[in-house]
Swiss-Prot record:
Protein name stated in the entry: Small ribosomal subunit protein uS5
Parts of the chain that traverse the membrane: none
Record text about domains: The N-terminal domain interacts with the head of the 30S subunit; the C-terminal domain interacts with the body and contacts protein S4. The interaction surface between S4 and S5 is involved in control of translational fidelity.
Assembly information from the UniProt record: Part of the 30S ribosomal subunit. Contacts proteins S4 and S8.
Organism: Treponema denticola (strain ATCC 35405 / DSM 14222 / CIP 103919 / JCM 8153 / KCTC 15104)
Length: 173
């Protein structure tokens, strides 16, 4: 019995190191014979503010269950954003269906200049300075997926040096 309590405490401790942000909560209604039956969908972003971030989409008949499911999926689908001094290393553009997201590095002190969806992702990732522009479709799900597509195109200094056949000092100077 006491062993189970310890493992529960460990799980609670790991939950506190993540920042959870609700991006979108949607209510849908199905009309049935007795009236309307509501269901909920939630889109959340989870990050450790050290460069690792993930997103999840959950559906349920209750708001709290939908949020819980989306957070679990977000923790399972974490990716790494290579951050350098609180910003991204270079400009990048990601696309998903009708949405396109442009991410640009910024000088320290600029802050995160972004819309709500991109801002939630970057704050969860731990970025402090960033410029962004969302183009095309403003659907929250599409913007999130376009942002993660942009993240997959980001290269840190080691990857850039390896692709050019140079050392890290040659690339960053």
């Amino acid at each position: 019995m006491s062993h189970q309590k310890e493992s529960k405490r460990d799980n609670q401790h790991t939950d506190k190191e993540y920042v959870e942000k609700l991006v979108k909560l949607n209510r849908t209604a199905k009309v049935v014979k007795g009236g309307r039956r509501f269901s909920f969908s939630a889109l959340t972003v989870v990050g450790d503010q050290k460069g690792r971030v993930g997103y999840g989409f959950g559906k349920a008949n209750d708001v709290s269950d939908a949020i819980r499911k989306s957070i679990e999926k977000a923790k399972a689908n974490m990716v790494t954003f290579p951050l350098k001094n609180g910003t991204i290393p270079h400009e990048v553009q990601g696309k998903f269906k009708g949405s396109s997201v442009l991410l640009r590095p910024a000088c320290s002190g600029t802050g995160i200049i972004a819309g709500g969806t991109i801002r939630a992702i970057m704050e969860a990732a731990g970025a402090t300075d960033l410029l962004s522009k969302s183009l095309g479709s403003s659907s929250a799900v599409n913007v999130v997926k376009a942002t993660f597509d942009a993240a997959s195109l980001l290269m840190d200094g080691k990857k850039i040096a390896k692709s050019r056949g140079k050392t890290l000092l040659d690339v960053w100077g």
